[in-house]
């Protein structure tokens, strides 16, 4: 009986993603192919799912969009692609998704998503207010003879 339930759940995963091709596409992109109920979609196209049969911490997940702000994000997904209102629900800070109870507007929340620029030339580097302990040596300029 237990084997039948395991096979049934495996078949539900394959059919839940639109067949074998859709299952493999989701599996290779996210390294997991869960099936759950669609809770909502944000303004960027990310889809949020929930399955209460999974244990806590793995019962809510996101399937990222393939294009965001004109950038192809099929293989280049980033955790900062989740808006703040969905972050609350995704990390179980609140039980109500933003589709049923919208998050209050805050002035520090961006209206349009900005990608994480850590490790790129656009990253923020604060100005150093301390003096250098070691000064680099600059040789005196002498004309060539």
UniProtKB/Swiss-Prot annotation:
Keywords: Acetylation, Electron transport, Membrane, Mitochondrion, Mitochondrion inner membrane, Respiratory chain, Transport
Coiled-coil segments on the chain, per record: none
InterPro entries: NDUFA12
CC per GO annotation: mitochondrial inner membrane; respiratory chain complex I
UniProt-annotated location(s): Mitochondrion inner membrane
Modified residues (N-acetylmethionine): 1
Membrane topology recorded in Swiss-Prot or TrEMBL: Peripheral membrane protein
Superkingdom per UniProt: Eukaryota
GO biological process: response to oxidative stress
Chloroplast as UniProt keyword: no
Pfam families reported for this sequence: NDUFA12
Complex and partners: Complex I is composed of 45 different subunits.
Its job: Accessory subunit of the mitochondrial membrane respiratory chain NADH dehydrogenase (Complex I), that is believed not to be involved in catalysis. Complex I functions in the transfer of electrons from NADH to the respiratory chain. The immediate electron acceptor for the enzyme is believed to be ubiquinone.
Family membership: Belongs to the complex I NDUFA12 subunit family.
Official protein name in the record: NADH dehydrogenase [ubiquinone] 1 alpha subcomplex subunit 12
Originating organism: Pongo pygmaeus
